[in-house]
């Protein structure tokens, strides 16, 4: 086995997705850096992985990474794993990989499942261009809506209904897919416009939210008027920018529409 750092993907729900190569690597490296040694312990027991392990997570990386780099420079083989999926994808791991690269330590990847990509594929939305934004931040949703192509988020079941409501306000014209419990027994994909999904039973489990690209066609006058009513209470400058972005019209046209609306209210 070549010395270096091995970035190993692990199942995101179905243990049958563990690759033979991943098992072989984890059984034969000198040390495993796990996000949570207790969580990994269950996987290790199932696949008879007895390799020594240490914790390496977002709260201790600054202390642990230098020690791991020293071990790697001394010729040891180290594998890094997260609780599920690929390390470094909204999980610890990228700092260790970056540090290894900086000192010339070889880095190898043992690919595994990624919830974000699985959710994207299940959504049926375009995959030629997409942006993964990690865990959804509602405060950044308005800026995210400027992204014209497919967007992928991770989200908590405790916040998903508030998120759907926010999307109904900010990006009502974009379809969304809520994909839950990927590769597990209760895997489910729910697709619709945000307003249509506001009455669904709150989905449980691990969630991926995929947002379809912004519509290329311009909205109808009736649809634009509905948006105007929604944002008329905001300042003229921000309202015009919001209307232009959401309706696919120029800012000049947006100002005109808002002024017309103001005249109707006088």
What are these regions (language model features)?
Residues 95-147:
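Class I SAM-dependent methyltransferase SAM-binding "motif I" and its flanking Rossmann-like core
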Residues 26-32, 104-107, 150-151:
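Short active-site oxyanion
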Residues 74-85, 89-92:
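Ordered, amphipathic secondary-structure segments that act as subunit-interaction surfaces
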Residues 2, 76, 150, 154-266:
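A contiguous loop/helix-start segment that scaffolds small-molecule binding in enzyme catalytic cores
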Residues 38-40, 86, 115, 159:
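Alpha-helix capping/helix-boundary segments
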Residues 34, 109-112, 153, 178:
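General beta-strand structural signal in soluble alpha/beta enzymes
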Residues 56-62, 136-137:
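Conserved helicase motor
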Residues 1-58:
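Glycine-rich, flexible N-terminal cofactor/catalytic loop recognition
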